[in-house]
Amino acid sequence: MRHAVRIPNALRRPSVAYSPYVYSNNRWYHASPYRSRPSLEPRLEDHGRVIHDEYSVIRDKYAAPKYPVVLAHGLLGFDELRFAGRYLPGVQYWRGIKEALTARGIEVIIATVPPSGSIEARAEELARDIELGARGKDVNIIAGLDSRYMISRIRPEKFKVLSLTTIASPHRGSSVADYVFDQIGAERLPQIYYALNRLNVETGAFGQLTRKYMTETFNPNVPDIEDVRYFSYGAAFEPSIWSAFRMSHRVLASIEGPNDGLVSVSSSRWGGESGYKGTLMGVSHLDLINWTNRLKWLAGEVTGNRRKFNAIAFYLDIADMLSKEGL
């Protein structure tokens, strides 16, 4: 006699089916997995500038902003990760980016916040780190939601924030977070949170990444400040069959449209029409912090397929943009 095996919800196939048609911005486009998709550009252009290969090569000259640049990691980020204590070099979150900025005379402050703490707790730590590093100077920040909260609600008194540049930040939440919570189920969530807390993993940030929380709670209570300049970038790519983002990309694409595997372009946009600097094409969420670029550039050299995105060139160009804005 055969016994039925109950499959936990978290292991089931996604409830969001991969539809051959995806709707966004009042347009339909065909997305059959059996044939190449038409260009995504018509949809992306509705959001603003589409960036293809402007950051494939590091230029000889970049202007340096007048004031220090703060780099602060996002969810599950870190300053330096050490797998073997002092015996092996640590893995840096901003690998190569900080060094490239510093080499061109740009003062860089690296801020470290709790990897998965609540936005409020991370913002408090961010303010303390910047205060120590800035020593009273005005700063330009490249970060995300924590910085928005810090600027709007904490209002630091010992330093002034001139600008905030966000890169693929989920300003309107992420349907990936919605999907994960839906799969876990409300009845099992306390058990998972308890287990994570036992491992000293803070859980405050997870529920704050849902679309409902961001649009109904966070954004209405965290308004932009008039004397701060807000800039933003989004990213979009089509994952390969081997990509770790294949499932999350599918969920996002079916609900929000073009995305980088974790955050959609529509959720990334912030700062109004003039503040949104463009959508990086063919770039995943990990590409944005230079984690995957080294392997991809090496593979490109071997196969002859030239990479179109270099994270270091991108961050240098952000610094150049800040300089041209008088910051």
Pin down the residues of each PLM region.
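N-terminal mitochondrial targeting presequence
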Residues: 1-41
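Short amphipathic alpha-helices and their capping/turn segments at secondary-structure boundaries
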Residues: 43, 48-64
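Active-site catalytic motif of lipid deacylating hydrolases and related acyltransferases
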Residues: 64-139
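Hydrophobic/aromatic beta-strand patches that form the interior of the parallel beta-sheet core
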Residues: 70, 109, 165, 231-233, ...
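Serine-dependent carboxylesterase/thioesterase catalytic core
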Residues: 73, 124-222, 260
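Short aromatic-enriched loop/helix-cap "lid" or pocket-rim segments at secondary-structure transitions
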Residues: 82-84, 173-180, 241-246
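Glycine-rich, phosphate-binding/catalytic loops in enzymes
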Residues: 86-89, 151-156, 180-184, 249, ...
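C-terminal catalytic-base region of ester-bond hydrolases, centering on the histidine
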Residues: 226-327
